[in-house]
């Protein structure tokens, strides 16, 4: 459990939708994606809102209420190390995408995001971080368009 009082508040992104992800096993599969993305509050002000695109999965950035901080941390634990933390002033971004296939519904495949685009209106231009997905990581780039 993440009972650590030193945890920073997070901005949380949630989306649940059907999509297709290209996996590290080099095949396409229909994916029931339930992604939880967390961005350090030092990187993104609580007031911001906007889209984040991870491959074919899109979500909206929303500020997490203090009461949801524990639930967010629990999701990070449930990701079984699939969340990748990056230290430094840039904060961190992590994604856990359980997909359908192989081990059954919700089985966590090591999916690779083909592209990550964050609107520059959502993130300060100085933001530099990584998206961790399974055992792969991709840079988070800033763009004015998805």
UniProtKB/Swiss-Prot annotation:
A GO CC annotation given for this chain: plasma membrane
Compartments, record wording: Cell membrane
Superkingdom of the organism of origin: Bacteria
Record-annotated membrane-spanning stretches: 1-21, 35-55, 87-107, 111-131
Topology term for the membrane: Multi-pass membrane protein
Alphabetical keyword list: Cell membrane, Membrane, Transmembrane, Transmembrane helix
Subcellular location, principal: membrane
Ion transport is among the record's keywords: no
Signal peptide: none
ATP-binding among keywords: no
Protein name: Uncharacterized protein MT2143
Organism annotation: Mycobacterium tuberculosis (strain CDC 1551 / Oshkosh)
């Amino acid at each position: 459990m993440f009972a650590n009082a030193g945890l920073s508040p997070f901005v949380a992104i949630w989306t649940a939708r059907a999509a297709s992800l290209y996996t590290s096993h080099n095949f396409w599969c229909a994916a029931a994606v339930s992604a939880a993305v967390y961005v350090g509050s030092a990187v993104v002000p609580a007031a911001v809102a906007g889209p984040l695109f991870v491959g074919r999965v899109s979500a909206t950035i929303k500020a997490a209420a203090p009461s949801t901080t524990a639930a967010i941390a629990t999701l990070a634990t449930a990701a079984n190390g699939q969340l990748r933390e990056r230290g430094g002033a840039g904060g961190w971004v992590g994604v856990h995408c359980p997909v359908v296939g192989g081990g059954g519904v919700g089985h966590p495949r090591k999916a690779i995001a083909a592209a990550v685009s964050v609107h520059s209106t959502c993130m300060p231009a100085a933001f530099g971080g990584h998206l961790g997905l399974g055992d792969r990581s991709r840079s988070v780039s800033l763009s004015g368009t998805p």
